[in-house]
Regions:
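Metabolite-binding pocket within alpha/beta catalytic cores that recognizes anionic/polar moieties
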Residues: 1-154
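Non-catalytic positions within long, well-ordered alpha-helices that form the structural scaffold/packing
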Residues: 98-102, 200, 219
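Short acidic/polar active-site loop segments enriched in Thr and Asp
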Residues: 104, 205, 224
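Polyanion-binding loop/helix "lid" in catalytic or ligand-binding cores
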Residues: 147-158, 184, 196, 252-264
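Active-site/ligand-binding-proximal alpha/beta "capping" segment
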Residues: 163, 169-205, 263
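Zn-dependent metallopeptidase/amidohydrolase metal-coordination segment
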Residues: 209-247
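His/Asp/Glu-rich mid-to-C-terminal helical/loop segments that flank catalytic regions of hydrolases
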Residues: 236-270
Length: 270
């Protein structure tokens, strides 16, 4: 796997020598943020040898290199998911690659279902911790010694220091911020009401199909991690509404301006 990472990095370096300080993964419906930054270079996933390609509507499938204010960043405009048929090692390959490019901190964003009944569609949730019991760990298999230790500590996946910065950014921007635990399930189907009752009993506040595995891979290689979920719908059984992907995009569009404001402030502050 490390050789594959090196090959992907070489492929990118043939196209740009841009060195990001921070990385951002843009979730479903949130990819338009990449159009708002000062862009220096775009590298499509299809241009990178051996790179997994996103197939989901609302995920463009490219790295965007550029600046948020004066901060050099790399944005993933579209991620790959386990449910697309990729191995978990391939799912986290882009995260690891951004770390190898030079990014020391990563902001993970996603569209998520609200499990906590006090949440509402359009809320932002600071991810304080996660549950990945239902999906394979990206660290299964031979350990990549060049990246990190065999048995990494996960007692603080999401940096408490960065969490405090996000809280301050939200307050400064006048944007209400929920907080909670994110649980990653496999997808692509939405969850049943019984499954939602189960994860709520585990302590989950939001549910989705990505992010936690990327956070684990990033922490394994020593990156500082923070995360924000956009609650685009209430999970099955929490409300009577039927679930569909169009609703995810509609809610993300509705809060796009607040998302842009919050993410810009966070990137410059972390």
């Amino acid at each position: 796997m490390y050789k594959k990472l090196e090959k992907c990095l070489k492929s990118i370096r043939e196209k740009t020598d841009f060195k990001p300080e921070k990385a951002v993964i843009l979730g479903s419906g949130l990819g338009d943020y990449a159009e708002k930054i000062k862009r220096e270079k775009i590298v499509k996933y299809t241009e990178i040898e051996g790179f997994p390609v996103s197939t989901v509507q609302g995920h463009k499938g490219q790295f965007v290199f550029g600046y948020v204010k004066d901060v050099p960043v790399v944005l993933m405009q579209g991620r790959v998911h386990y449910y697309e048929g990729y191995s978990m090692q391939d799912v986290v390959l882009p995260t690891r690659l951004m770390g190898m490019m030079g990014a020391k901190k990563v902001l993970l964003t996603n569209a998520a279902g609200g499990v906590n009944p006090s949440f509402r569609p359009g809320d932002f949730m600071l991810i304080t911790d996660h549950i990945t019991t239902a999906v394979p760990s990206p660290l299964i298999g031979p350990n990549i010694e060049e990246l990190g230790t065999r048995f990494p500590d996960m007692s603080e996946v999401y940096s408490k220091k960065l969490q405090d910065i996000i809280r301050k950014s939200a307050k400064d921007c006048g944007i209400p911020l929920q907080e909670g635990v994110y649980v990653q399930l496999t997808g692509p189907n939405y969850e049943t009401p019984a499954e939602i009752r189960m994860v709520r009993s585990w302590g989950a506040d939001a549910v989705g199909m990505s992010t936690a595995c990327e956070a684990m891979a990033a922490r394994h290689m020593g990156m500082e991690v923070c995360g924000i979920s956009c609650i685009t719908n209430m999970a099955a059984g929490v409300s009577d509404a039927k679930l569909n992907h169009a609703e995810v995009q509609e809610t993300a569009d509705r809060v796009a301006k607040d998302f842009e404001k919050l993410v810009t402030d966070v990137i410059t502050a972390i």
